[in-house]
Amino acid sequence: MATENKILILGATGAIGRHIVWASIKAGNPTYALVRKTSDNVNKPKLTEAANPETKEELLKNYQASGVILLEGDINDHETLVNAIKQVDTVICAAGRLLIEDQVKVIKAIKEAGNVKRFFPSEFGLDVDRHDAVEPVRQVFEEKASIRRVVESEGVPYTYLCCHAFTGYFLRNLAQIDATDPPRDKVVILGDGNVRGAYVTEADVGTYTIRAANDPNTLNKAVHIRLPNNYLTANEVIALWEKKIGKTLEKTYVSEEQVLKDIQTSSFPHNYLLALYHSQQIKGDAVYEIDPAKDVEAYDAYPDVKYTTADEYLNQFV
């Protein structure tokens, strides 16, 4: 169904931004993308490259062919940013972790433009107001939380999107460092493997984001994506994979104490990924009760969405 809600995506060619663009187009929203004159990042982590093989140039051509309105600009260029924002109703920022704090510039531009009905700051992970993460991830979460406070203090209408674990980072390799596919012989499990995590495909994040953007009931609330068939422990995920390949994997369980040591002695991106895995698989940062006054559970709000289950997602690797 077509909608008049004009949506601008910042970070539209990134790992999650591209899925938000396609979901917006599919939903019938007039869709805009702020695009910088830059080439692809040749230093993309292997997981990111495996999940998103399409180049930036290919992506932009496909956007144009699909009706996306490309606006040349940059978060750090106030004039082009304001001009872009003035053309839309909703701004969704999917900028990477290095640009989190730069969103104060987006907020400033939104305030100047004066027409934005909703802003989605770049989160797309766990709820940054509910976590027990360690460094180096903790700093990023704290930066995201500080952006929330600026949004609220400035009176900018918002929605926070908490999607937890992308399948492209957590499921396609069963959270194995330096692997891009699920293991077939041995698997390392952080903690006891009995803590539930919330998995979701990047495409489904796009779908739920746009549903929330078009839903007045999510105004000034956080939307949580914890889908019943994807709300699983590491042991449950591994059992799904073992059933598919007809083989029992050799399992090594790593204590929290050892994981914390490994985080401290590893370099980026290993330490960052380990800290993310620690947050979900050991600390259980996807397990919490929501407050209906300020939170929305995506599955309950949009039960008609046909999401990809963890079981279905793993079929491609058999």
Swiss-Prot record:
Pfam entry (one): NmrA
Reaction equation(s) it catalyzes: (3R)-vestitone + NADP(+) = 2'-hydroxyformononetin + NADPH + 2 H(+)
First-tier enzyme category under EC: oxidoreductase
UniProt keyword annotation of Oxidoreductase present: yes
Sites where the protein binds NADP(+): 11-17, 36, 44, 148
Record keywords: NADP, Oxidoreductase
Enzyme Commission number(s) of this protein: 1.3.1.45
UniProt keyword Nucleotide-binding present: no
Gene Ontology MF term list: 2'-hydroxyisoflavone reductase activity
Biological process annotations from GO: lignan biosynthetic process
Pathway: Phytoalexin biosynthesis; pterocarpan phytoalexin biosynthesis
Catalytic residues in the record: 144 (proton acceptor)
Origin superkingdom: Eukaryota
Family affiliation: Belongs to the NmrA-type oxidoreductase family. Isoflavone reductase subfamily.
Function: Reduces achiral isoflavones to chiral isoflavanones during the biosynthesis of chiral pterocarpan phytoalexins. The reduction product (sophrol) is a third isomer, which represents the penultimate intermediate in the synthesis of the phytoalexin (+)-pisatin, the major phytoalexin in pea.
Official protein name in the record: Isoflavone reductase
Organism, scientific name: Pisum sativum (Garden pea)
Gene: IFR
